A protein has these predicted regions:
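Active-site helix of classical SDR
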Residues: 2-5
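Conserved beta-loop-beta element that borders a ligand/cofactor-binding pocket
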Residues: 7-32, 58, 112
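Alpha-helical substrate-binding/gating segment
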Residues: 26-29, 45-58, 66-91
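Glycine-rich Rossmann NAD(P)(H)-binding loop
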Residues: 29-33, 59-69, 91-99, 117-122, ...
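Short, solvent-exposed loop/turn segments at secondary-structure boundaries
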Residues: 34-39
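Hydrophobic "lid"/C-terminal helical patch
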Residues: 48, 79-83, 105-108, 144, ...
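Conserved C-terminal active-site "lid" loop/helix of NAD(P)H-dependent oxidoreductases
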Residues: 72, 100-103, 118-150
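Mid/C-terminal beta-alpha module of Rossmann-like enzyme folds, strongest
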Residues: 78-120, 129
Length: 158
């Protein structure tokens, strides 16, 4: 509800005061500088932190939850393209490819441990409108399997 009201307010400010805007939605952003170990950490940051500490990766049951993971460099590119076009529109920035949490955890090639499901856990998160591809020429160029493979090769201290 709050997000909807904020969007409504932004659009009204545009009408009332000529405010220029672009509304961008990000999907599970990962990459350099991400949060690794607080309540605000996303799944890739959590997995990286656990991997570096040689701990089992924790997966919220059932593990089949699907997400679209987007690298920060692709997000920055999408933001720039939206700013450059200046269409006063909404864009969803992602890869259009989903992976289950268990698939991502297995990419780290380490031990996995399941933890109980949480109330309110989303089962699926995906882009439902690809207007960023159509209107901005946006296309994600970094995929999560390659990112994780590079992360492991840089940080595998066996």
């Amino acid at each position: 509800w709050t997000k909807t009201k904020n969007i409504e307010l932004i659009k009204n400010y545009s009408k009332w005061f000529g405010l220029r805007y672009e509304l961008l939605y990000f999907y599970n952003v990962y990459g350099p500088g991400q949060i690794l170990n607080t309540k605000m950490a996303a799944v890739i940051g959590i997995f990286e932190n656990q991997f570096l500490k040689k701990k089992s990766l924790t997966i919220v049951k059932p593990g089949s939850q699907k997400r679209d993971f987007t690298h920060i460099d692709d997000i920055v590119t999408g933001c720039y393209l939206a700013w450059k076009k200046g269409r006063q529109s909404e864009y969803m920035l992602g890869t259009k490819k989903q992976y289950s949490i268990i698939e991502v955890a297995k990419m780290f090639k380490t031990k996995i441990r399941y933890i109980p499901s949480r109330k309110g856990e989303r089962f699926k998160s995906s882009i439902i409108n690809n207007n960023a591809y159509k209107h901005l020429g946006y296309s994600a160029s970094i995929d999560i399997p390659n990112y994780i493979e590079n992360f492991i090769s840089k940080n595998n201290f066996s």
